[in-house]
């Protein structure tokens, strides 16, 4: 529940910031009449992401067992790529995202008689990017942790992001966004490492990867996945009490370079904004 909550909170807050920045800029530049058009783009993006998620989830439920495992592995790999890209993309562009959005709005509203649709499409693509990232992560998360709690966590994360977005727009709160994105990014890298290890496990169960399947270590006597804390670790970080050598290797092969790249100072002009 916690991982879907945090990821969707972060993704939802990014989308809320985009919408808030666009709405604030339209109001500040005496173009508030276009805010309704902006919301059309938001709703279209939300409908696309929701429809795609439902379609993929319903379609894959009919797959045979091995094809299901293969699909789970592919979705996990896509989720790892998306989460990693999300972390480093936000780290790179967060300082200039406000200027970039304002320039995109100006460009959309200068395209002749059809600039309303240009604004709709600009907002649609900006919000849909965040939503599609969430869709593939949730597909991977729901496959690893079945039950009602992951969807509930995702809905709570989305609701929290919406509330925070409105409060930011109205000026009711100020968040240290730099710290928020920094610590959630670090957490996400560990989540992605667990997904990468889970992808190798899924590929093995699908019959595509049969190398290095010896048990690396057995922690069942110390931290069983049947215990409360073990279950939480499994749901959050993909913990396995008796992982294979290939799972452990993939975990380290992904995480160590990712952490090194993360702790290195960002290039000039790519530091995160402090607050909003």
UniProtKB/Swiss-Prot annotation:
Question: How the protein assembles, per its UniProt entry?
Answer: Part of a ferrous iron transporter composed of EfeU, EfeO and EfeB.
GO MF term set: ferrous iron transmembrane transporter activity
Q: How does it sit in the membrane?
A: Multi-pass membrane protein
Question: What induces its synthesis?
Answer: Expressed in response to iron deprivation at pH 7.
Reading the lineage from the top rank, the first entry is: Bacteria
Role played: Uptake of Fe(2+) ions across the membrane.
Residues assigned to the Cytoplasmic compartment are 23-34, 91-118, 169-179, 266-276
Q: List the disulfide bonds.
A: none
Where is the protein localized? Cell inner membrane
What keywords is this UniProt entry annotated with? Answer: Cell inner membrane, Cell membrane, Ion transport, Iron, Iron transport, Membrane, Transmembrane, Transmembrane helix, Transport
Q: What is this protein called?
A: Ferrous iron permease EfeU
Note the SUPFAM superfamilies from the entry: MFS general substrate transporter
Cellular component (GO) terms are: high-affinity iron permease complex
* Annotated family: Belongs to the oxidase-dependent Fe transporter (OFeT) (TC 9.A.10.1) family.
NCBIfam families reported for this sequence: EfeU, EfeU/Ftr1 family ferrous iron transporter subunit
């Amino acid at each position: 529940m916690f991982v879907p909550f945090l990821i969707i909170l972060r993704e939802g807050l990014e989308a809320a910031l985009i919408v808030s920045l666009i709405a604030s800029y339209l109001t500040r530049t005496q173009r508030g009449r276009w805010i309704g058009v902006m919301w059309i783009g938001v709703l279209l993006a939300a409908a696309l992401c929701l429809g795609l998620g439902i379609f993929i989830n319903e379609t894959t439920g009919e797959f045979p067992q091995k094809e299901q495992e293969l699909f789970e592995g592919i979705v996990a790999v896509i989720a790892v790529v998306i989460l990693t890209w999300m972390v480093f993309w936000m780290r790179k562009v967060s300082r200039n995202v406000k200027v970039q959005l304002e320039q995109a709005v100006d460009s959309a509203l200068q395209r002749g008689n059809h600039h309303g649709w240009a604004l709709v499409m600009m907002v649609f693509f900006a919000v849909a990017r965040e939503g599609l990232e969430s869709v593939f992560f949730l597909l991977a998360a729901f496959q690893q942790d079945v039950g009602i709690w992951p969807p509930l966590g995702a809905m709570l994360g989305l609701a929290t992001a919406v509330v925070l977005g409105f409060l930011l727009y109205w000026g009711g709160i100020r968040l240290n966004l730099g710290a928020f994105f920094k610590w959630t990014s670090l957490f996400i890298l560990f989540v992605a490492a667990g997904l990468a290890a889970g992808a190798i496990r899924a590929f093995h169960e699908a019959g595509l990867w049969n190398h290095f399947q010896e048990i690396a270590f057995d922690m069942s006597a110390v931290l069983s996945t049947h215990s409360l804390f073990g279950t939480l670790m499994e749901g959050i970080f993909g913990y396995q009490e008796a992982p294979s050598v290939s799972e452990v290797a993939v975990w380290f092969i992904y995480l160590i370079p990712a952490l090194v790249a993360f702790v290195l100072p960002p290039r000039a002009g790519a530091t995160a904004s402090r607050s909003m």
